[in-house]
Every structure is written in structure tokens, then in C-alpha cells.
Amino acid sequence: EIAQCLVGSEMCIRDRDNTDWSKYNGFVKVYNQSVDIASLYLVSDMLITDYSSVMFDYSLLDRPMYFYCYDLQKYKNVLRGFYFDFENSAPGPVSVTTLSLVDDIINERHKDFAEKYGEFKRCYNPWDDGLSSSKVIDVLFSHNGGSEGV
């Protein structure tokens, strides 16, 4: 269902379970755990994830995020739970079925989460202003910082 929704696209999957993806050859590129996930962020247009912490890093890119949480209630109530109100704070649509996930992607429902996305970034990445390198250079070469501050 997801493959049909993304016709003409290419999916990059970082597989933990050694799933057989061969029937999707040419459409799905599979990467094992040795591949740095950050390199996949850079070539992606959107993220489909579950409760993974990748949402925090990926939010820095200002790209759409969709959450496929087929086991949401079990995860929340039986397995691990959350450190924050995931359902109300997620920076994108939360789907519990593949049908609703596909519908969310087709209808670009991530656009309905612009405000929540901004709140999420302000909460979890408050220092990100795109000027980190400049700030480091300023500290390294400032008269007050000098080499003794490094």
C-alpha cells in the first residue's frame, strides 16, 4: 500500500530485522545498521518512523514526518511508554494503520502540523538557529575567548 502511494519515488529503509525486500527491487534501497542514519536524512524528502528518537534529529531539516505506530496503545501502556505526550506533541500525523498512513501521505497532512512542528523544534532543539558554526568561530577567535578558552 505504501509502495503504491509512493510510485515514482525511491524508499530508503534502514532495516533492523533482515526483512526480505527483494520484491521491491528498484524501488526500495535497504541499508543495514552499519550505515549512519544521518547520511540517509540528507537524501530524504520525508521521514516515516515510529517512536524512534530519529524524530528529534530529523526535525532540524524542516522536512515532513509521518509516524506509523501500529502498536501505539501497547507501546504506551505495556512496553516502554513515553517521556512526553507523544500523541499530542508529535510533529506530524500519527497513524495506527497502513491505510491511514497512506491517506496522510497522499493528502500531505504533515502541512496541518506546522504549528506543532515549530513547537516541537523550540522544545527539543532550542539552540538551533543555523548559526552554530559561526558561533564556534566567534568563540575561537574572539579577543576574550582566545586559545585559553578552548
Question: In which residue ranges do the predicted regions lie?
Answer:
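C-terminal alpha-helical cap of glycosyltransferases
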Residues: 129-150
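Short, contiguous acidic/charged loop-to-helix segments that flank catalytic cores in large enzymes
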Residues: 30-38, 89-92, 125-127
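Donor nucleotide-activated moiety binding/catalytic core segment of transferases
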Residues: 17-56
